[in-house]
């Protein structure tokens, strides 16, 4: 998972980053709240670890921006030296999902992050299974079948589809998709838009098939797997996509 760390103390930042890297996560450390805010308009993360007091824009302000502008399920963990009970209450009431006081205990930090991610992304750790609804993935042949028929996909369209199905519920920015699938973000974001449009059409990614691609204005997309209550019942009057 991609984790953003806001920590202006280099020693603490190294401990947090090392601990989470050892747990298999990708980390980006910010020592300045203003810089982090600027990057949040370009980058997507799956969890945030915030210190309280940092230069320019402090942790609670960052938390407020996250809650106002990003999907509500994104987990936020405060890791701070503020250990008064009132501080803990204030942080949780402001929208943090958990609160941990320094000094940092590596195993506890890993456990808290794992628990937050498990609650926020219950489907993400599950591999794509052959027979996901009407979508069947042949990972060896790099093919996807819809209702028993192999869909004609270009190589990059297949990679994009596989990435979406492996990351349900996550906000995927244009930059993130470009870096993961094209190896660089120095490409026009319309490349992603074009591929996504073609993929939605070819794979018929819509609620009637139990999935949907939700555009997140100015950022990117979120791929959602719907439960039975959210899936419309097909009728003979259903319109074509």
Question: At which residue positions do the language-model features occur?
Answer:
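Nucleotide phosphate-binding site architecture
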Residues: 37, 55, 107, 152, ...
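Short, Lys/Arg-enriched segments at the junction into DNA-binding effector domains
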Residues: 2, 114-171, 175, 228, ...
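N-terminal/domain-start alpha-helical segments
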Residues: 1-121
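A short linear beta-strand->loop->alpha-helix hinge motif most characteristic
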Residues: 209-241
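Residue-level signal for beta-strand positions within conserved beta-sheet cores that form or flank
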Residues: 23, 72, 133, 209, ...
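Positively charged, aromatic-enriched patches within helix-turn-helix-type DNA-binding elements
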Residues: 143, 148-155, 159-219
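Generic structural signal for secondary-structure transition and capping sites
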Residues: 45, 71, 118-122, 169, ...
